[in-house]
Amino acid sequence: MTVKTETAAGASTLTYSKMRGMVALLIAFMKQRRMGLNEFIQKIATNSSYSCKPSEVQSILNISPPQESELLNENSSPPPSHSQQINLGPSSNPHAKPSDFQFLKIIGKGSFGKVLLARHKADEKFYAVKVLQKKAILKKKEEKHIMSERNVLLKNVKHPFLVGLHFSIQTTSRLYFILDYINGGELFYHLQRERCFLEPRARFYAAEIASALGYLHSLNIVYRDLKPENILLDSQGHIVLTDFGLCKENIEPNGITSTFCGTPEYLAPEVLHKQPYDRTVDWWCLGAVLYEMLYGLPPFYSRNTAEMYDNILNKPLQLKPNITNSARNLLEGLLQKDRTKRTGAKTDFMEIKNHIFFSPIDWDDLINKKITPPFNPNVSGPSDLQHFDPEFTDEPVPNSIGQSPDSILITASIKEAAEAFMGFSYAPPMDSYL
């Protein structure tokens, strides 16, 4: 294929390979320009004393436009291979902003903000958008947990039972996680309605949860906050683990940590003792959730928190006779107060996977979602909100949530927030849009 172009020197032939060279140079130029702009903006946002001088702009952006002679050079280099292309990584790809979305309903609330159902205006896809107030996060000094949640979400793209992150964006006052929209309801909601589950249904959910936890552990991530409120059902009835704010990264197989965190009903004894703990805290929590699915309440529950803590530390596990021996054996292993003797302490997920309780599970079929879930939430589509609390869905959506400010007045608090959440923004690489 050839293309004729007219120049001052006369007609010249532009071959297909030359066109590819032009495209490669232009793409490299655009990417270089984008990186320079990002550095320039960050410098302004985090340094109020910085005065931008026209002579400095070119050096800060660090770009020079490709010349026509470069684009039409007979000996131009071939376009870079995929492995040679510049990898911008998970940072400020400008492909999403709040005003790109139509915010339809509030579907949940948390300590720092709301979760909303939103539709992307361009492709009309539905997302769950977690909107957090920077001021509230900074006030409670939780910025590290938020950034950790963002980092963990970026690693979840390969597992079917973990919620996926599509974009993370920010304005001067808010952070936005654009996530998979899951509308089958929380496991907590279904447990409240049905009180407890039959053993086959509990086994199915426990297997999918264990698979998700095992994947996180393979990435050296400890989840630390497993509870029915953080376990969603998708539209077919598969579980989806969400809310990674308490995850601890970089915990090797024999690594330990010591931060006191979690939800009272599901805290492991070693956490309550304020002792160093490892990834087996997640297997304790799995035992607590499995117990609750089978019996209707967490294993050592009391309305009095101090009494419940004492139960977790000192009271023997009591199991009613209406479960199978394999379920009993697994619960006794997972809810072992000595973490070194707990099921999962030796070979982590493999020990769970090979337990007799899960012998009916084909794990390959499970991970590929070939096993029909024992319960179908029967949602008619994305707008079906039957499994969300009307307390949330009836609340009006604030107009400000969908606004992308055109101009920014740099203040001390905005500068502090810019520094605290630097690198938060994420979009898929540009190649995925081409």
Curated annotation (Swiss-Prot):
Residues 359-434 form the AGC-kinase C-terminal domain. GO terms for biological process: apoptotic process. Its EC number is 2.7.11.1. It is found in: Cytoplasm; Nucleus; Endoplasmic reticulum. Residues 101-358 form the Protein kinase domain. GO terms for molecular function: ATP binding; protein serine kinase activity; protein serine/threonine kinase activity. Residues 68-94 are annotated as: Disordered. It holds the Pfam family Pkinase_C. One of its GO terms (cellular component) is cytoplasm. Keywords: Apoptosis, ATP-binding, Cytoplasm, Endoplasmic reticulum, Kinase, Nucleotide-binding, Nucleus, Phosphoprotein, Serine/threonine-protein kinase, Stress response, Transferase. Its main location: cytoplasm. The active site is at D225 (proton acceptor). It comes from the Eukaryota. It catalyses: L-seryl-[protein] + ATP = O-phospho-L-seryl-[protein] + ADP + H(+); L-threonyl-[protein] + ATP = O-phospho-L-threonyl-[protein] + ADP + H(+). ATP binds at I107, G108, K109, G110, S111, F112, G113, K114, V115, K130. Protein kinase that may play an important role in cellular stress response. Plays an important role in activating certain potassium, sodium, and chloride channels, suggesting an involvement in the regulation of processes such as cell survival, neuronal excitability and renal sodium excretion. Belongs to the protein kinase superfamily. AGC Ser/Thr protein kinase family. This is Serine/threonine-protein kinase Sgk1-B. The lineage of its organism: Eukaryota, Metazoa, Chordata, Craniata, Vertebrata.
